[in-house]
């Protein structure tokens, strides 16, 4: 059994969404893509954002970061808005 499960990750990621707002993550595919992108950053030399990861594998670290809230998934719309403010 994989821990945390996709369902658990989706609940954590969508935890701060207000009632009536669009959830950040609608599918398992979104979680997989986010974890893969973060794992690629770690492989390319980015430091883990958690102090003591349970595993040394980049994908496991990325999943743990998502689960603990150390990494946030940003929608394309949010990313564009942040770029305009800068």
Swiss-Prot record:
Q: Which GO terms describe its molecular function?
A: DNA binding; DNA-directed RNA polymerase activity
The EC number(s) attached to this protein equal 2.7.7.6
Reactions accelerated catalytically: RNA(n) + a ribonucleoside 5'-triphosphate = RNA(n+1) + diphosphate
Could you provide one GO biological process annotation from this protein's UniProt record?
DNA-templated transcription
Q: What InterPro entries does the record tag this protein with?
A: DNA-dir_RNA_pol_omega, Pol_omega/Rpo6/RPB6, RPB6/omega-like_sf
Q: Which GO terms describe its cellular component?
A: DNA-directed RNA polymerase complex
Cross-referenced Gene3D superfamilies, in alphabetical order?
A: 3.90.940.10
Alphabetic keyword roster: DNA-directed RNA polymerase, Nucleotidyltransferase, Transcription, Transferase
Q: What class of enzyme is it?
A: transferase
NCBIfam families recorded? rpoZ (TIGR00690)
Q: What does this protein do?
A: Promotes RNA polymerase assembly. Latches the N- and C-terminal regions of the beta' subunit thereby facilitating its interaction with the beta and alpha subunits.
**Which family is it part of?**
Belongs to the RNA polymerase subunit omega family.
What's the subunit arrangement here?
Answer: The RNAP catalytic core consists of 2 alpha, 1 beta, 1 beta' and 1 omega subunit. When a sigma factor is associated with the core the holoenzyme is formed, which can initiate transcription.
Per its record, how is this protein called by name?
DNA-directed RNA polymerase subunit omega
Organism field: Agathobacter rectalis (strain ATCC 33656 / DSM 3377 / JCM 17463 / KCTC 5835 / VPI 0990) (Eubacterium rectale)
Starting at the broadest rank, the lineage of the source organism is:
Bacteria, Bacillati, Bacillota, Clostridia, Lachnospirales
């Amino acid at each position: 059994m994989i821990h945390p499960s996709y369902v658990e990750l989706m609940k954590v990621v969508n935890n701060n969404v207000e009632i009536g707002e669009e959830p950040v993550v609608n599918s398992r595919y979104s979680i997989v893509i986010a974890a893969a992108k973060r794992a690629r950053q770690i492989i390319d030399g980015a430091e883990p954002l958690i102090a003591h990861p349970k595993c040394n594998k980049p994908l496991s670290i990325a999943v743990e970061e998502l689960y603990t809230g150390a990494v946030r998934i940003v929608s394309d719309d949010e990313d564009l808005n942040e770029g305009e403010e800068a």
